[in-house]
């Protein structure tokens, strides 16, 4: 049923929104509130809320209009996060984490055509991005990465990292992850890489019986990815 709901939401994702942002956010918040208790009790992904998020085209609201988004500001994004979070903590947190990753790509992509195409696709298909910044023994030290980006022939890269936590990783359409710049780089010499789901596989390592915001489905995974080197997010 969940897969069917997502498919139905994406079927209409290309249509431009006809309602203003507050109206759309209010509608999504109502759906999130209706399922908040079930989401937290069962520690399950808020599928109904994100069906509504996609239907109301909220995932690309801060992306520039030239790339298919609405070009809205961080204040607008914060308002939606606040409204969704009041209705369902997990829904609000997932939406906020997604928007942070979108903002990272926007801030640093420059003239990178590959990343621009990723944002176009995100808006057109209403794709959800996850974040992977914790790893192995590093725990909460997001300024240290064990796993290096490995450069291959033909402008390709590979990455294999043990992520101690990827929130909603099994439900996301892509992930933005930290990695060591290269095998001979120090652990603090990091890059960010953006992958679509077709670029990687996830193998579950561990669960997390969380207290609060249980619908974020934060679990540990081994992430194995192969993609274009152009998906490394440029430095400012």
PLM regions and their residue ranges:
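Flexible, small-/acidic-enriched active-site or ligand-binding loops
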Residues: 200-227
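A generic structural signal for well-ordered coil/turn residues at beta-strand boundaries
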Residues: 127, 143-145, 171-173, 189, ...
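A short core secondary-structure module
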Residues: 165-204
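Glycine-rich flavin
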Residues: 47, 51-54, 60-167
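Fold-independent oxyanion-binding glycine-rich loops
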Residues: 133-136, 161-163, 179-180, 195-198, ...
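A glycine-rich, basic-preceded beta-loop-alpha segment at the flavin cofactor/substrate interface
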Residues: 224-236
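Short helix-loop capping/hinge motifs at secondary-structure junctions, enriched
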Residues: 111-112, 202, 228-231
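Alpha-helical interface subdomain recognition
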Residues: 2-79
